[in-house]
Amino acid sequence: MVDKEKIEIAVRMILEAIGEDPDREGLKDTPKRVARMYEEVFAGLSQDPSEHLERYFTEEHEEMVLVKDIPLYSMCEHHLLPFYGKAHVAYIPRKGKVTGLSKLARVVEGFAKRPQLQERLTSQIADAIMEKLNPRGVLVVIEAEHMCMTMRGVKKPGSKTITSAVRGIFATSVATRAEAMALIGHQSPLRD
């Protein structure tokens, strides 16, 4: 549970620390707005995103399932600045155990809505799917632009960070991994 009152106090102190008047017209409601925003963007802290995968069904399908271009928004834990982009999630069911496609998007969203590192986010999604669905394999690729690289520091707008997590058959079979990467629209940079 987010303590909005503490956030409001902290935001007011930050405004004062940078030389602003937190009581001026344009800023007087800013602490409340920021507290509500943090409650929304960090909603994943109060949930276990893998619970979305507890509902599944058996289908006669043991080929690749890929949901690509899932929009995601998260906050870099180093600077509390946003990073945003898209996730691609592929898995190969074992014994026809599949989940709803929206559940994969909900897992991405749940893990993204917390202070994060893109590398950890990618692995958390893959590990949750492996644990809950026990598929033959999982591949997760995330492409994101980080505001901590765009608006401060090196100031390189438009640069993208790409991370991947490969589990099961995607880690052991070059052909399977290459098929997934081709469907996503990337050439596989990974080799056995």
Swiss-Prot record:
GO terms for biological process: one-carbon metabolic process; tetrahydrobiopterin biosynthetic process; tetrahydrofolate biosynthetic process. Zn(2+) binds at residues 76, 79, 148. Pathway: Cofactor biosynthesis; 7,8-dihydroneopterin triphosphate biosynthesis; 7,8-dihydroneopterin triphosphate from GTP: step 1/1. Keywords: GTP-binding, Hydrolase, Metal-binding, Nucleotide-binding, One-carbon metabolism, Zinc. One of its GO terms (cellular component) is cytoplasm. GO terms for molecular function: GTP binding; GTP cyclohydrolase I activity; zinc ion binding. Pfam families: GTP_cyclohydroI. The keyword Iron does not apply. It is an enzyme of class 3 (hydrolase). Its EC number is 3.5.4.16. It catalyses: GTP + H2O = 7,8-dihydroneopterin 3'-triphosphate + formate + H(+). InterPro entries: GTP-CH-I_C/QueF, GTP-CH-I_N, GTP_CycHdrlase_I, GTP_CycHdrlase_I_CS, GTP_CycHdrlase_I_dom. Toroid-shaped homodecamer, composed of two pentamers of five dimers. HAMAP family: FolE. Belongs to the GTP cyclohydrolase I family. This is GTP cyclohydrolase 1. It comes from Carboxydothermus hydrogenoformans (strain ATCC BAA-161 / DSM 6008 / Z-2901).
